[in-house]
Amino acid sequence: RSNKIKGNVGIAHTRWATHGEPSNLNAHPHISKNSVSVVHNGIIENYVALKNDQKKLGYEFKSETDTEVIAHAIDYSIKSSKTLIESVQKVVKSFEGSYGLGIMSSKFPDQIIATRKGSPLVLGVGSNGNYIASDQMALLSKTKKFIFLEEGDVAEVKLDKITIFDLDGNLVDRPVIKSKIKAGQVDKGNYDHFMQKEIFEQPQAIRDTLESRITNNSVTVSYTHLRAHETDS
């Protein structure tokens, strides 16, 4: 954290440890051959089979995570691909499970590839750059304009340009949505920590919840949706 890094393209990530213990070796991003870097939300369910195949190709594994197979798969695919996005489009077809991915390659240093399946991913459209996150809350300090990727989308994100392809490889135009959420709603503000903020904001949260449900000094709550949900299940 204390080391300053120069550059205009980068990825970083924090997540729960779904495979392996929390450790430096299991931390993201995962790197293959000092060429491909990957951050990943989700679970690759067939990672054991992929890992065994990659070991036969000479790949060595440094972590216990499922994410490392993604980096190696892309590194191998790049050898027969003209672009990074083409490589990603090829390899994601072999992944079973869910993923929200941010991918970089030293061979294509001006871009990040983002793709999702069963895991949310949002692109932030800024005036001085573009961003990737699993939730718009993480980007509110940078921009209020967002593109929400759809299932199977693969996006090429550059400093001043975003190009998106759908699951079938067709070039698509996803809408840019302006968020109404204020940055102050997701930071600590003047509080020492988030728990303190949550405690002191409870009255306002209750007020906001009940405001549209009070009629003639009585609280009206509709259980129609809950009943419908119970019936469906």
Where does each model-flagged region fall?
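A short, hydrophobic C-terminal helix/tail in secreted or cell-surface proteins
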Residues: 228-232
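Conserved short alpha-helical segments that host acidic/polar catalytic motifs at enzyme active sites
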Residues: 1-197, 201-227
